[in-house]
Amino acid sequence: MRTHIDDSASGKNHHLPMLWFFDSSLRLCAIPLSVATMWITVTNKEDNSSYGMLKYNNLSALKYMVLVSALCACYALLAAACSLVRCFVSKAWIFFVSDQIVAYLAITSVAAVMEMYYLAYNGAKEDSWSEACSSYGSFCSKVKLALILHTITFCCFFVIAVISAFRAFSVFDPPFVNSQEVQGD
């Protein structure tokens, strides 16, 4: 832990209000992005005379994305509210761990939907899966839009996770290297 404050440390504290503002802005931006992702996905359905009705709940990747989007929106709202309360702001490790978890969940749901979209768009002929987007074009377009919004949400949480990691680890000094040990080697 730091035992003294020097000029460089006070320079770091000068940027903390801007960092807090950027962090809060990203959290608040993630909320409408997550809500829009959920809305587009949940209301997405298309009927095809040959294959029948296709809804989001027919595909587990889309259900997972809706679940993670709901978690992202709720967590972003809770974390933004908690960042205004002084007793929670000092708990950098809580934000660090929870931001990491949410970012990892977001990237897993992006990957799952991206794989599902790739298979729906291109098919897998070696496995005898035909592409489905020619039959369900509107459905695929809305999935693509939801995937783009969810990817932007992930990017917000990725930057938030980097900021919270900086906050959690910036209270520690870098490792001390003894100059005698360096000269002796």
Swiss-Prot record:
Ranges per topology, Extracellular: 37-64, 114-145
Family classification: Belongs to the Casparian strip membrane proteins (CASP) family.
Superkingdom of this protein's organism: Eukaryota
Gene Ontology annotations for the cellular component aspect, listed alphabetically: plasma membrane
Ranges of the Cytoplasmic topological domain: 1-15, 86-92, 167-185
Keyword Metal-binding among UniProt keywords: no
Cited PANTHER family: CASP-LIKE PROTEIN 2C1-RELATED, CASP-LIKE PROTEIN 4A4
Glycosylation sites: N48, N58
Protein name: CASP-like protein 2D1
Entries under InterPro entries matching the protein: CASP/CASPL, CASP_dom
Major subcellular site: membrane
Compartment list: Cell membrane
The entry's keywords: Cell membrane, Glycoprotein, Membrane, Transmembrane, Transmembrane helix
